[in-house]
């Protein structure tokens, strides 16, 4: 594996697609990139992806979900941007922390090398030392794959993104022309008179070209498909062929985007430009499972309450997506009802009472915990199907300890370090940990599943491997008390409790791990499928009756 620029040989055979964005952030670069990758994978190519995040954080682990959405956890324990979750779901691959490049990670590595004397007294600068490190990371992530898609976070013109765009300019200079493709995603808004305006796209491309990058493909994010006049203007003023201008209009479900851009011919154009068309599978032999999965008709509809503290979908994105996947598997429309755990007022309580099932997700801190416990009590006492994830698992233990075991004031030591009954306590290996970033119990761990339990029925195996992100666990001193009162810990990692359930309840299931991070279209997470299937078995959910 090459470790420095001078070791690199362009003949290694990788193809690189760089995806940049203009006009504004949050346009959907990641979904555009992931959809392109999905279509190339359908054509028989081994595709991977890299997300560049130009912030100074080393990783996303300490970021506020209000600002950046959920922290997505990889198999190797990397805490990363939620876009990597979309890549894993669309491409059906397991990525690594090396597939996320941040400014903090890059600068730290360069500074460590300088301190170690690796630069032999040279003046360490953005060019060439930082840009060389960026290029090295991209090439190492791409090794062994046919195609690597690299998304550059942020918007062209952002000052923090400049070193990355310069690295890309150098990258293109070092590679063969038919091994590199630049895709630029921009906003094409409507004017008040209904005309699609291309000026923002023109200015965005002008900014990109001033850095030395010329896009090969332009993708217009718009409410509706680009009309011919808009395409002609974009092609003329941005200096790209008409055939290289594609639409990416709004859709109700992101899983339809690959089908839409396939109709536009984006995948075929990409393969032709990269010289991949002759190696691609014939259209009649390409995988159609994706289309079959995401376009199937639904026969049922369910409402599931999500009881959390972050009132935005991106903060719990993988849970929303996992419910979609469970819906694909059961031919069910799954509606999510947001319930604010911090304000369990009459409106939210009514929403909870109308729900067919309840999910209490992961999280940190004291805010909203009593509301979550209240929701768990409601689910347990009223036989409402319930799924608790990470903190939701822990709060289910707290609720049971208080209301069934009679342990007044029982709580998690994270929330109340003076409780008389710390049924949830800090992991022993965390006692001496002081740093916050990257120090939790992270990544994939195996769980042994007890035969004859709901967990065994769901996973259909004696063991499962799921991803974790936590510092606290069930206190071993209270396990006997909890079990003697009827709570079953059906999954364990040695002496650590990983799964809980109540045998006499239709579906009361909690996991210390995050099963949502391994769910995929066509391969939905077992706990989510179990939740939806139980609702269908115990509730009248016919779509026509619900609509009526």
From Swiss-Prot:
Gene Ontology MF term list: ATP binding; CTP synthase activity; glutaminase activity; identical protein binding; metal ion binding
Originating organism: Natronomonas pharaonis (strain ATCC 35678 / DSM 2160 / CIP 103997 / JCM 8858 / NBRC 14720 / NCIMB 2260 / Gabara)
Domain of life according to the entry: Archaea
InterPro entries for this protein: Class_I_gatase-like, CTP_synthase, CTP_synthase_N, GATASE, GATase1_CTP_Synthase, P-loop_NTPase
Described function: Catalyzes the ATP-dependent amination of UTP to CTP with either L-glutamine or ammonia as the source of nitrogen. Regulates intracellular CTP levels through interactions with the four ribonucleotide triphosphates.
Reactions the enzyme catalyzes: UTP + L-glutamine + ATP + H2O = CTP + L-glutamate + ADP + phosphate + 2 H(+); L-glutamine + H2O = L-glutamate + NH4(+); UTP + NH4(+) + ATP = CTP + ADP + phosphate + 2 H(+)
Quaternary structure (record): Homotetramer.
EC numbers: 6.3.4.2
Catalytic machinery residues: 390, 514, 516
Protein name, as recorded: CTP synthase
Miscellaneous field: CTPSs have evolved a hybrid strategy for distinguishing between UTP and CTP. The overlapping regions of the product feedback inhibitory and substrate sites recognize a common feature in both compounds, the triphosphate moiety. To differentiate isosteric substrate and product pyrimidine rings, an additional pocket far from the expected kinase/ligase catalytic site, specifically recognizes the cytosine and ribose portions of the product inhibitor.
Binding site for ATP: 26-31, 83
Protein's pathway: Pyrimidine metabolism; CTP biosynthesis via de novo pathway; CTP from UDP: step 2/2
Binding site for CTP: 25, 158-160, 197-202, 233
GO terms, biological process: 'de novo' CTP biosynthetic process; pyrimidine nucleobase biosynthetic process
Domain Glutamine amidotransferase type-1, residue spans: 303-541
Regulation of catalytic or functional activity: Allosterically activated by GTP, when glutamine is the substrate; GTP has no effect on the reaction when ammonia is the substrate. The allosteric effector GTP functions by stabilizing the protein conformation that binds the tetrahedral intermediate(s) formed during glutamine hydrolysis. Inhibited by the product CTP, via allosteric rather than competitive inhibition.
């Amino acid at each position: 594996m090459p470790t420095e620029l001078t070791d690199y040989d362009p003949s290694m055979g990788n193809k690189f697609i760089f995806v940049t964005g203009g006009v504004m952030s949050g346009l959907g670069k990641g979904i555009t990139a992931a959809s392109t990758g999905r279509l190339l994978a359908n054509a028989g190519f081994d595709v991977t992806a890299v997300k560049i995040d130009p912030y100074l954080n080393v990783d996303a682990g300490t970021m506020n979900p209000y600002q950046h959405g959920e922290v997505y956890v990889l198999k190797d324990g990397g805490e990363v941007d939620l876009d990597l979750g979309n890549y894993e779901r669309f491409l059906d691959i397991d990525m690594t922390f090396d597939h996320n490049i941040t400014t903090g990670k890059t600068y730290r590595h360069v500074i460590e090398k300088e301190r170690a004397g690796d630069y032999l007294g040279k003046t360490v600068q953005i060019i060439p030392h930082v840009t060389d490190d960026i290029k090295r990371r991209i090439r190492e992530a791409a090794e062994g794959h046919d195609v690597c898609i690299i998304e550059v976070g942020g918007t062209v013109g952002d000052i923090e993104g400049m070193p990355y765009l310069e690295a890309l300019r150098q990258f293109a200079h070092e590679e063969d022309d038919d091994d590199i493709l630049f895709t630029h995603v921009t906003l094409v808004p409507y004017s008040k008179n209904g005309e699609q305006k291309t000026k923002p796209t023109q200015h965005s491309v002008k900014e990109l070209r001033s850095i030395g990058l010329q896009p090969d493909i332009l993708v217009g994010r718009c409410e509706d498909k680009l009309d011919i006049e808009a395409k002609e203007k974009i092609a003329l003023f941005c200096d790209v062929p008409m055939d290289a201008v594609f639409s990416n209009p709004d859709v109700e479900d992101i899983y339809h985007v690959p089908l839409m851009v396939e109709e536009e011919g984006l995948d075929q154009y990409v393969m032709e430009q990269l010289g991949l068309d002759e190696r691609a599978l014939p259209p009649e032999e390409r995988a159609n499972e994706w289309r079959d999965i995401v376009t199937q008709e639904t026969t049922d509809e369910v409402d599931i309450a999500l009881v959390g503290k972050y009132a935005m979908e991106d903060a719990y994105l993988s849970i929303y997506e996992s419910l979609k996947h469970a819906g694909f598997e059961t031919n069910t429309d799954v509606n999510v009802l947001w319930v604010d755990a911090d304000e369990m007022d009459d409106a939210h309580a009514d929403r909870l009472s109308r729900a067919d099932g309840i999910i209490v997700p992961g999280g940190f801190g004291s805010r909203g915990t009593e509301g979550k416990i209240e929701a768990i009590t409601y689910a347990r006492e009223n036989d409402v199907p319930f799924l608790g994830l990470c903190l939701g698992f822990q709060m289910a233990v707290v609720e049971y300890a208080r209301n069934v075991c009679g342990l007044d004031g029982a709580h998690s030591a994270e929330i109340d370090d003076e409780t008389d009954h710390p049924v949830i306590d800090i992991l022993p290996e965390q006692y001496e940990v002081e740093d916050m970033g990257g120090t939790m119990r992270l990544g994939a761990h195996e769980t042994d599943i007890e035969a004859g339990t709901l967990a065994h029925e769901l996973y259909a195996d004696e063991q499962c491997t799921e991803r974790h992100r936590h510092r606290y666990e069930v206190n071993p001193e209270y396990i006997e008390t909890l079990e003697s009162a009827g709570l079953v810990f059906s999954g364990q990692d040695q002496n650590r409790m990983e799964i809980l359930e109540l045998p006499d309840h239709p579906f009361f299931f909690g996991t210390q791990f995050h099963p949502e991070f391994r769910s995929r279209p066509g391969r939905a997470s077992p706990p989510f499928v179990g939740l939806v299937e139980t609702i269908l078995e115990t509730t009248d959910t016919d779509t026509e009756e619900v609509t009526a």
